[in-house]
């Protein structure tokens, strides 16, 4: 059964090759896409229903139906030590797709010199398992289905 993955935030859908980090751009962690968020306060929501297997101020990993989905808010944002991010849930929580998980402000992160493009990855999946549901360049709202993994 295919797992539908939602955009964790509003923004422009981008190919992973646009992400200026080879770990994501070369799909080393798995296939997916990226979201270039609007500047200003943004709420990152759960892209799938499941268990928050990992949760950091700058990232979330959700286990769902045997799949693991990663949202990484911006790049190299771990060095901010949580500054500019507000975590709304706890590791181990069960969440529903579309539920708010982390509040952040991409404009603050960008002002600090860090990229805000946000990879959305199906961890350790194969590219052949992914069906992208919206074209690169499409502007989506949080909660819009963007790909399926099967």
List the predicted regions and their residue ranges.
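Contiguous, well-folded functional domains in the mature portion of proteins
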Residues: 1-150
């Amino acid at each position: 059964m295919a797992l539908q993955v939602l955009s964790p935030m509003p923004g422009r859908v981008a190919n992973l090759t646009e992400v200026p980090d080879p770990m994501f751009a070369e799909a080393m962690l798995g296939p997916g896409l990226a979201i270039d968020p609007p500047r200003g306060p943004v709420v990152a929501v759960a892209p799938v229903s499941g268990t928050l297997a990992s949760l950091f101020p700058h990232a979330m990993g959700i286990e769902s139906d045997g799949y693991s989905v990663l949202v990484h808010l911006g790049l190299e944002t771990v060095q901010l030590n949580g500054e500019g991010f507000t975590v709304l849930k706890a590791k181990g929580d069960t969440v529903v797709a579309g539920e708010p998980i982390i509040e952040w402000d991409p404009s603050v992160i960008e002002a600090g010199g860090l990229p805000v493009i946000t990879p959305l990855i199906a961890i350790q999946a194969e590219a052949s398992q992914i069906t992208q549901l919206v074209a690169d360049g499409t502007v989506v709202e949080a909660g819009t289905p963007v790909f399926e993994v099967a």
